[in-house]
């Protein structure tokens, strides 16, 4: 780990301004991903801005009847919140499917959204990786790619986004609230938050330099059956090969989003319109642009079967 300076700030505006003022600065809250990356010198911030004291740890009901989740709400607290468990069960279940209890106690809402890929080539500084070192190449393209993306890929990167929480939040039409160094606030839908890899996979989100996430807002809850199904190599502390988040109504309508298959939570609204036609029709829409490698083609069949299993469960409990 390389040397860095450290400061604590008192307001979100102060945090954003400090991040803009100091080149190479990073925000730190739970640190569950950032500290690992710093130890490996994948992330080498010159300055850490501790945002834990900003009071962004509340869950509040909005005037519209939704929820406003502070950026610093810990994953454990969010999953256990009475309103989340009752009205946004898919989110609670996704959170509990991720990481371990110890990590959930420390990890924050904003940090979960911003966590980096777990591609082994990203973590190996001896390997080329366009996400870590732009222009160096992508070792995964011709390497071990069993866990990598099958949709939304480019010739520069085939890494997946690892978050379970983000998949559920995308299903729920979450909106990310931020503050810029100029003191302006922005609202970014989660649908627009993650950038496709294209030729610049190192630019992962829509955040501007120094911009700080302050909250995530959820619209009023949707009724129906909430399901989160995660398929992985072992029963705990493993990232998804494929995951499916779904909210299905008694009449068979609803919405679905997938994890483990792309650089972001994978949702195509046109697929929702196919739910009444069954899993095959939904799958065909979601994976029309699939571009798997020889090693991860199995994910396509796995995704189709997981979709079918989720829809069958929803029908059985309707």
Swiss-Prot record:
<dbReference type="GO" id="GO:0110095">
    <property type="term" value="P:cellular detoxification of aldehyde"/>
</dbReference>
<keyword id="KW-0479">Metal-binding</keyword>
<dbReference type="GO" id="GO:0047770">
    <property type="term" value="F:carboxylate reductase activity"/>
</dbReference>
<dbReference type="GO" id="GO:0050660">
    <property type="term" value="F:flavin adenine dinucleotide binding"/>
</dbReference>
<keyword id="KW-0285">Flavoprotein</keyword>
<dbReference type="GO" id="GO:0051539">
    <property type="term" value="F:4 iron, 4 sulfur cluster binding"/>
</dbReference>
<feature type="binding site">
    <location>
        <position position="119"/>
    </location>
    <ligand>
        <name>[4Fe-4S] cluster</name>
    </ligand>
</feature>
<keyword id="KW-0574">Periplasm</keyword>
<dbReference type="InterPro" id="IPR016167">
    <property type="entry name" value="FAD-bd_PCMH_sub1"/>
</dbReference>
<dbReference type="GO" id="GO:0071949">
    <property type="term" value="F:FAD binding"/>
</dbReference>
<dbReference type="InterPro" id="IPR005107">
    <property type="entry name" value="CO_DH_flav_C"/>
</dbReference>
<feature type="binding site">
    <location>
        <position position="213"/>
    </location>
    <ligand>
        <name>FAD</name>
    </ligand>
</feature>
<dbReference type="GO" id="GO:0009056">
    <property type="term" value="P:catabolic process"/>
</dbReference>
<dbReference type="InterPro" id="IPR036683">
    <property type="entry name" value="CO_DH_flav_C_dom_sf"/>
</dbReference>
<dbReference type="GO" id="GO:1990204">
    <property type="term" value="C:oxidoreductase complex"/>
</dbReference>
<keyword id="KW-0004">4Fe-4S</keyword>
<feature type="binding site">
    <location>
        <position position="157"/>
    </location>
    <ligand>
        <name>[4Fe-4S] cluster</name>
    </ligand>
</feature>
<feature type="binding site">
    <location>
        <position position="138"/>
    </location>
    <ligand>
        <name>[4Fe-4S] cluster</name>
    </ligand>
</feature>
<feature type="domain" description="FAD-binding PCMH-type">
    <location>
        <begin position="1"/>
        <end position="223"/>
    </location>
</feature>
<dbReference type="GO" id="GO:0016903">
    <property type="term" value="F:oxidoreductase activity, acting on the aldehyde or oxo group of donors"/>
</dbReference>
<keyword id="KW-0560">Oxidoreductase</keyword>
<dbReference type="GO" id="GO:0046872">
    <property type="term" value="F:metal ion binding"/>
</dbReference>
<comment type="function">
    <text>Oxidizes aldehydes to the corresponding carboxylic acids with a preference for aromatic aldehydes. It might play a role in the detoxification of aldehydes to avoid cell damage.</text>
</comment>
<dbReference type="InterPro" id="IPR051312">
    <property type="entry name" value="Diverse_Substr_Oxidored"/>
</dbReference>
<comment type="subunit">
    <text>Heterotrimer composed of PaoA, PaoB and PaoC.</text>
</comment>
<feature type="binding site">
    <location>
        <begin position="26"/>
        <end position="34"/>
    </location>
    <ligand>
        <name>FAD</name>
    </ligand>
</feature>
<dbReference type="InterPro" id="IPR002346">
    <property type="entry name" value="Mopterin_DH_FAD-bd"/>
</dbReference>
<protein>
    <recommendedName>
        <fullName>Aldehyde oxidoreductase FAD-binding subunit PaoB</fullName>
        <ecNumber>1.2.99.6</ecNumber>
    </recommendedName>
</protein>
<dbReference type="GO" id="GO:0030288">
    <property type="term" value="C:outer membrane-bounded periplasmic space"/>
</dbReference>
<keyword id="KW-0408">Iron</keyword>
<feature type="binding site">
    <location>
        <position position="230"/>
    </location>
    <ligand>
        <name>FAD</name>
    </ligand>
</feature>
<dbReference type="GO" id="GO:0042597">
    <property type="term" value="C:periplasmic space"/>
</dbReference>
<dbReference type="InterPro" id="IPR016166">
    <property type="entry name" value="FAD-bd_PCMH"/>
</dbReference>
<feature type="binding site">
    <location>
        <position position="164"/>
    </location>
    <ligand>
        <name>FAD</name>
    </ligand>
</feature>
<feature type="binding site">
    <location>
        <position position="129"/>
    </location>
    <ligand>
        <name>[4Fe-4S] cluster</name>
    </ligand>
</feature>
<dbReference type="InterPro" id="IPR036318">
    <property type="entry name" value="FAD-bd_PCMH-like_sf"/>
</dbReference>
<keyword id="KW-0411">Iron-sulfur</keyword>
<dbReference type="Pfam" id="PF00941">
    <property type="entry name" value="FAD_binding_5"/>
</dbReference>
<feature type="binding site">
    <location>
        <position position="108"/>
    </location>
    <ligand>
        <name>FAD</name>
    </ligand>
</feature>
<keyword id="KW-0274">FAD</keyword>
<dbReference type="InterPro" id="IPR016169">
    <property type="entry name" value="FAD-bd_PCMH_sub2"/>
</dbReference>
């Amino acid at each position: 780990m390389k040397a860095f300076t450290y400061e604590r700030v008192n307001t979100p505006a102060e945090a954003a301004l400090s991040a803009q003022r100091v080149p190479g600065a990073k925000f730190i809250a739970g640190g569950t991903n950032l500290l690992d990356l710093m130890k490996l010198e994948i992330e080498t911030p010159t300055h850490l801005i501790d945002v834990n004291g900003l009071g962004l740890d509340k869950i509040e009901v909005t005037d519209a009847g939704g929820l406003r989740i502070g950026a610093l709400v810990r994953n454990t607290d969010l999953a256990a919140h009475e309103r989340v468990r009752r009205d946004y069960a898919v989110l609670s279940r996704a959170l509990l499917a991720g990481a371990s209890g110890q990590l959930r106690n420390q990890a924050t809402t904003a940090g979960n959204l911003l966590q980096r890929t777990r591609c082994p080539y990203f973590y190996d500084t001896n390997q080329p990786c366009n996400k870590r070192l732009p222009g160096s190449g992508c070792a995964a393209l011709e390497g071990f790619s069993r866990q990598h993306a099958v949709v939304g890929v480019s010739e520069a990167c085939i890494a997946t986004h690892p978050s379970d929480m983000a998949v559920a939040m995308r299903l729920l039409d979450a909106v990310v609230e931020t503050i810029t160094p100029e003191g302006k606030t922005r609202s970014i839908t989660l649908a627009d938050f993650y950038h496709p890899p294209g030729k610049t996979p190192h630019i992962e989100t829509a955040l501007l330099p120094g911009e700080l996430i302050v909250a995530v807002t959820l619209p009023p809850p949707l009724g129906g059956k909430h399901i989160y199904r995660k398929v992985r190599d072992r029963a705990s502390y493993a990232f998804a090969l494929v995951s499916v988040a779904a909210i299905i109504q008694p009449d068979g309508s609803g919405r679905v989003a997938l994890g483990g298959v792309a650089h972001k939570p994978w949702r195509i609204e046109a697929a929702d319109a196919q739910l009444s036609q069954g899993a095959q029709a939904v799958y065909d829409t979601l994976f029309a642009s699939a571009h798997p490698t020889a090693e991860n083609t199995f994910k396509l069949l796995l995704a189709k079967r997981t979709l079918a299993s989720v829809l069958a469960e929803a029908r059985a409990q309707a």
